Amino acid sequence: MKTTKEQQNGEMKDNNLPQDVANQTESVNESRRRFAKSSLAVSGVLLTLASRPSLGSGGGFGGGGMCKSPSGLMSGNLSVHGSPQRCSGRTPGYWGNHGGGGPQPNAWPSPYLPGSCQKKCTNSSNWSNGTKFSSVFNCNGNGSRYNNYSLMQVLWLGGRGDPYQLGAHIVAALLNAQKGWTPVLTVAQVKNIFNEWNDKGYFEPTAGIKWYAADIVYYLKSTMPE
């Protein structure tokens, strides 16, 4: 377990994450290199975006919380003039700490329920009840590993139970969309991303471009600058 603290609006924010999750967060450069080498490298647009400031520098592609929809990201429009979309989504660590056992209990948006935890709430198995992951997403294919877990449990599975942290970031994206913090992603779009990956092993933001698990996570992080 690793605890990090960030200064935000004059207050300290604790982010408690499993060690493997924290390590992934700290290896932004490695994520960017993997992203550039992935199937997304087919698009020169994405190579340009991947070379911009890291997601830790204000969040979003280009920093400052700027974000794009999956299809918009592929369009090639890099202009920041006019009224760019800005996302204020929260990370999996935020939502994991703002449920029934966190410092701000019951902060999840309706109708999603975090469930309850009596002790060691950073351990996925210590959570009970809560909205089932399979009641929101299809889990009959590549997503079968998440079938028996709640949304909160998926947040705390860690890298071994949740490769690339895809499940955790999908849950965070779902809650962010329900809160209205990601104007480029609706709840329906988040569900579609995961369900298509469940069926095919990848998601196509546009015809012929395939986003695999690591690519989807990289994109979702761009909507979570907070």
Regions found by a protein language model. Name each.
Residues 58-226:
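Soluble extracellular-acting proteins and domains
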Residues 22-23, 43, 82, 158:
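A general structural-boundary detector
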Residues 10, 15, 38, 44-47, ...:
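Intrinsic-disorder/low-complexity peptide segments enriched for small residues
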Residues 1-30, 48:
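N-terminal secretory signal peptides
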Residues 23, 27-28, 32-55:
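N-terminal export signals
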